[in-house]
């Protein structure tokens, strides 16, 4: 099959919970991809976490055969993309593999921030966009109001928006006809030389790495020798095929088609999303535009609660890395926590997913240190560094300036919660860039330091807006800031795992809050425990946990006073020795407390 006018490559753009995966399920069911008895909810979401959280993490594709009302049979390639900001680059590459998009909006909720970000990416990729209003069978549905929102905010004509209910199957045939009639076919291939876009990849224990591709020019055949243009790696293609969503093996993928291939590739890290694949013997002259390496932006430490589990943690991280090359890790040691790993993530959701998979799939109990970001350090001697571990920050006297990453955030929030959201953004050192109204909701654009976002911003935003605010962000610039390293000392010894980098204006407040929290969490011992917060050599906050007093005179019922003095002196010498050699046991809850100072 190589008649491109009967191919439609499309994706579904939607905010979380607006019905993207449910609509995909209905389309698969309607086109006979699965029999009714084989259907399960969210067919394309393969991980348990994806189904439970209602999110899509890995891009998935499905090839459907649809006999349209014009009598022709069409091949519909549905690309189910991640919707969350952490996976924004994967979304942009998945959209680059398609010519059109269905914009699904919940008719009871309206346009959300995440919808905006992804629809703008689709417009950048010159997509034809078909608006679809979902959940029209609910009493709270307001289709006319939401149509107006789509026109006002996004600027596309929504007068002919499709009214559907993915859950009950209303209007699914209208969606399929719109895909055929309104979305364009792939452009005719201008060249016989293979040029393909690498959309996604994952690890299969039997086949090695499976690569999802969109063929732009030429054809991809079994036994062909191919070259990855970003890494110059060469492989021999072993299997070629497509998903319906079951795996089907074919001999060839032609221009305009989306499918998969395997080539005995050992690790996902060798397959860069957005890379161009070409023929080794007759390579194409230019790679496809838009490729960039996926770099982590949030870092934190993972330490096993039991040091004997270190090797198991190492193996578990290696297995996760097979399937997710955007997650990075390296070994590090801490005087307080022992040996663990410093891990890099695309964002906070990505961090949570990896943490949850380690707990669920590998049954690991971990201590997680406070998240941090990459800081650029410019030294007085002209040297420049990039650090993501607060313990690595050099002496402040040697530093000329420190730059931190700032983000551009779009927040859409109902009017009644606007004041609380503006206060939160101001507290987080935000700078307002834009403020506009959409019916009874406000759209605000802020510039915020990423350091302030990674702790508790999202939770507090949801809390102060009762869950109604939606939040979308993208990396903006690095800018100089008055940053300092806030260290924590317990009985004069620095606890590196509790050190954080904070803005100078917030250092004292944060230090006091952390000392108070630690005072409540560290158990009372037989000696005084002094908890201090410091900036360099200056102590800015202190709390003392008074010693548990052991009454050594309880058995002295009178008698010579010198006997009592001797016992008290012996106790004093013992306590001095404990202070000198005794290690204070800091419980796991104390490290978790470092993440939650903002809740005070």
UniProtKB/Swiss-Prot annotation:
InterPro entries: EF-4, EFG_III/V, EFG_V-like, EFTu-like_2, G_TR_CS, LepA_C_sf, LepA_CTD, LepA_IV. Keywords: Cell inner membrane, Cell membrane, GTP-binding, Hydrolase, Membrane, Nucleotide-binding, Protein biosynthesis. Coiled coil: none annotated. It catalyses: GTP + H2O = GDP + phosphate + H(+). GO terms for molecular function: GTP binding; GTPase activity; guanosine tetraphosphate binding; ribosome binding; translation elongation factor activity. One of its GO terms (biological process) is positive regulation of translation. It is an enzyme of class 3 (hydrolase). Its EC number is 3.6.5.n1. Residues 5-187 form the tr-type G domain. It is a peripheral membrane protein. GTP binds at residues 17-22, 134-137. It is found in: Cell inner membrane. PANTHER family: TRANSLATION FACTOR GUF1 HOMOLOG, CHLOROPLASTIC, TRANSLATION FACTOR GUF1-RELATED. NCBIfam families: lepA, small_GTP. Belongs to the TRAFAC class translation factor GTPase superfamily. Classic translation factor GTPase family. LepA subfamily. Required for accurate and efficient protein synthesis under certain stress conditions. May act as a fidelity factor of the translation reaction, by catalyzing a one-codon backward translocation of tRNAs on improperly translocated ribosomes. Back-translocation proceeds from a post-translocation (POST) complex to a pre-translocation (PRE) complex, thus giving elongation factor G a second chance to translocate the tRNAs correctly. Binds to ribosomes in a GTP-dependent manner. This is Elongation factor 4.
């Amino acid at each position: 099959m190589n008649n491109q006018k009967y191919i439609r490559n499309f994706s579904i753009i939607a905010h979380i919970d607006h019905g993207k995966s449910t609509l995909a399920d209905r389309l698969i069911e309607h086109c006979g991809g699965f029999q009714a008895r084989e259907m399960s909810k969210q067919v394309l979401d393969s991980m348990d976490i994806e189904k439970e959280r209602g999110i899509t993490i890995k891009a998935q594709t499905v090839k459907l055969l649809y006999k349209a009302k014009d009598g022709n049979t069409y091949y519909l390639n549905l690309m189910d993309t991640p919707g969350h900001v952490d996976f924004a680059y994967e979304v942009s590459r998945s959209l680059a593999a398609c010519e059109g998009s269905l914009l699904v909006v919940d008719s009871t909720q309206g346009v959300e921030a995440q919808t905006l970000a992804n629809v703008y990416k689709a417009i950048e990729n010159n997509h034809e966009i078909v608006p679809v209003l979902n959940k029209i069978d609910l009493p709270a549905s307001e289709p006319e109001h939401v149509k107006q929102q789509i026109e006002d905010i996004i600027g596309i004509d929504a007068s002919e928006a499709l009214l559907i209910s993915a859950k009950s199957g209303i209007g699914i045939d209208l969606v399929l006809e719109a895909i055929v009639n309104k979305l364009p076919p792939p452009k005719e291939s201008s060249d016989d030389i293979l040029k393909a876009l690498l959309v996604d990849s994952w690890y299969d224990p039997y086949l090695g790495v499976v690569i999802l591709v969109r063929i732009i020019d030429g054809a991809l055949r079994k036994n062909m020798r191919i070259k990855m243009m970003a890494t110059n790696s060469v492989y021999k293609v072993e299997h070629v095929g497509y998903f319906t969503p079951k795996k089907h093996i074919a001999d060839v993928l032609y221009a305009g088609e989306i499918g998969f291939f395997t080539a005995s590739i050992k690790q996902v890290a060798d397959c860069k999303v957005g890379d161009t694949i070409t023929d080794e013997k007759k390579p194409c002259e230019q790679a496809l535009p838009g490729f960039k390496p996926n770099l982590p932006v949030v870092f934190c430490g993972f330490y096993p609660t039991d040091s004997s589990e270190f090797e198991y943690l190492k193996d578990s991280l290696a297995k996760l890395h097979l399937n997710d090359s955007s997650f990075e890790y390296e070994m590090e040691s801490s005087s307080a926590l022992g040996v663990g790993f410093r891990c890099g993530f695309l964002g906070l959701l990505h961090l949570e997913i990896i943490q949850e998979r380690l707990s669920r799939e590998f049954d690991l109990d971990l201590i997680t240190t406070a998240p941090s970001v990459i800081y650029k350090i410019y030294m007085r001697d002209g040297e420049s560094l990039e650090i993501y571990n607060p313990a690595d920050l050099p002496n402040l006297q040697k530093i000329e300036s420190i730059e931190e990453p700032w983000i551009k955030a779009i927040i859409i929030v109902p009017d009644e919660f606007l004041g609380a959201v503006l206060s939160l953004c101001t507290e987080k050192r935000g700078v307002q860039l834009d403020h506009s109204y959409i019916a009874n909701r406000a759209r605000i654009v802020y510039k915020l330091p990423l350091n302030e976002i990674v702790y508790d911003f999202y939770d507090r935003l949801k809390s102060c807006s009762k869950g109604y605010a939606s939040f979308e962000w993208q990396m903006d610039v690095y800018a100089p800031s008055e940053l300092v390293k806030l260290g924590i000392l317990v009985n004069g010894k620095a606890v590196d795992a509790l050190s954080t980098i904070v803005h100078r204006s917030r250092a004292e407040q944060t230090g006091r809050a952390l000392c108070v929290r630690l005072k409540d969490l560290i158990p009372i011992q037989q000696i005084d425990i002094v908890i201090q917060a410091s900036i360099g050599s200056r102590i800015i906050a202190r709390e003392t946990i008074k010693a548990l007093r052991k009454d050594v005179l309880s058995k002295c019922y009178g008698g010579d006073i010198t006997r009592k003095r001797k016992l008290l002196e012996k106790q004093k010498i013992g306590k001095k020795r404990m202070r000198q050699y005794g290690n204070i046991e800091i419980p796991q809850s104390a490290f978790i407390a470092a993440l939650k100072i903002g809740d005070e």
